[in-house]
Structure formats: C-alpha cells, structure tokens
C-alpha cells in the first residue's frame, strides 16, 4: 500500500493515544484518526454548540418573561417609532 505524503491537514490530524497496560508504561502512537473517531469528535463539538445556542435562546426568553425596566422602555420606544413611520394608513 502506498503511503500518503504528510500535508498540513494530515499533520494536524495526527494524535497520540496513550494506553496504560499493566505497568502503565506502554504508549501507542496512532497515525490519523479513523472515521469513527472523527464522527465522535464532530458530534461532541456540535452538541456543545447546540447547548450554547439553547443557553442563549433561554436567556433571551427569560429576559422577555422578566424584562428589566430599561429593556421595556427601549422596546416601547422602538415600537412607537416604527408605528409613527407607518402613519395612520393601516
């Protein structure tokens, strides 16, 4: 089998997997992660991103459920200005 040349991508995807056996002294170096490892990593990252999105939307929802006075004032002014721009044509 022909060996691939190292490119910046393959160099960056190389990793070291340390497995402790018996005396805990053996280390095994793996070349590139296999597709299962890449998929696990991808799913882990995406679930972290999803958790962040949920947290942000939850905070926004909470601010709507229990808004501060400043937030209400700003929101009311924005609505009033947009209403005045439309005029009484509606």
From Swiss-Prot:
InterPro entries: Flu_proapoptotic_PB1-F2
Protein name, as recorded: Protein PB1-F2
Family: Belongs to the influenza viruses PB1-F2 family.
GO biological process: symbiont-mediated perturbation of host apoptosis; symbiont-mediated suppression of host cytoplasmic pattern recognition receptor signaling pathway via inhibition of MAVS activity
Function of the protein: Plays an important role in promoting lung pathology in both primary viral infection and secondary bacterial infection. Promotes alteration of mitochondrial morphology, dissipation of mitochondrial membrane potential, and cell death. Alternatively, inhibits the production of interferon in the infected cell at the level of host mitochondrial antiviral signaling MAVS. Its level of expression differs greatly depending on which cell type is infected, in a manner that is independent of the levels of expression of other viral proteins. Monocytic cells are more affected than epithelial cells.
Region (Mitochondrial targeting sequence): 65-87
Site (Low pathogenicity): 66
UniProt subunit comment: Oligomer. Interacts with human SLC25A6/ANT3 and VDAC1. Interacts with host MAVS.
Keyword check for Repressor: no
Record carries keyword S-adenosyl-L-methionine: no
Remaining remarks: Is not encoded in all strains, and seems to be dispensable for replication.
One cellular component (GO) term of this entry: host cell cytosol
């Amino acid at each position: 089998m022909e060996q691939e040349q190292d490119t910046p991508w393959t160099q960056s995807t190389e990793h070291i997997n340390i497995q402790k056996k018996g005396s805990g002294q053996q280390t095994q170096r793996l070349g590139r992660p296999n597709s299962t490892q890449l998929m696990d990593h991808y799913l882990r990252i995406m679930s972290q991103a999803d958790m962040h999105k949920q947290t942000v939307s939850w905070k926004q929802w909470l601010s709507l459920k229990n808004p501060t006075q400043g937030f209400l004032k700003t929101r009311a002014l924005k609505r009033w200005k947009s209403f005045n721009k439309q005029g009484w044509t509606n």
